[in-house]
Amino acid sequence: MFLLVLPLSLFPMRVVAQSSYPETVSVMEVVLKGELLARARYVSYAAKAREENYPRIAALAIALAASEDIHGRNFQKVLRDLGCRPSMEVPTVAVGDTRANLHNASKAELEEIDTRYPQYLARIRPENYSEAIAALTCAWKAESQHRDLISELFQGSGVLFGLLARTIEGTPVEYFVCDNCGSTLPELPRDACPVCAGPVSRYFRVDTGT
């Protein structure tokens, strides 16, 4: 009797991942798409802010785009480690004026922090895939930093937006992002990354073009 033995590498690993970690795979695919959208959104917002002569707002958008890019990279790695081939298609985004863009960004960050990320973590924790839990937890904490950075500008996105924005634009600004977790800060932390506890050396200064 002839028995054909196929090497394990020929079997679709994604089937194994889906059977062992179905919720983790599902959530990681969703959040990866979300990060690709967020990065595209902030890149577009930065271009619009420059067009409207708000270089500091553009700088913030560039820093946030860099952070979202790191989140996406981490989610992509989790999926690949599980044997999946995630789609990296960049979505198109709607862009308004800078005031509207700040409003939309603040709303999106708030929804992620208060609703989506807690729900996603609750879904994947029972499967206990530690890399996915760590990546999602770090992204959640970094998104809270995004909200805080945006809130300074969003508070003035009503009738006083123009006056407040012009005042803010006169203040020099730098942004630093942790290349491990996407933590985004206006200055380097003193000891370690407040999100992933990595060394300060993991932070890079974002080239905002200002």
Where do the PLM segments sit?
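Non-heme di-metal
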Residues: V16-T210
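Bacterial N-terminal signal peptides
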Residues: M1-S9
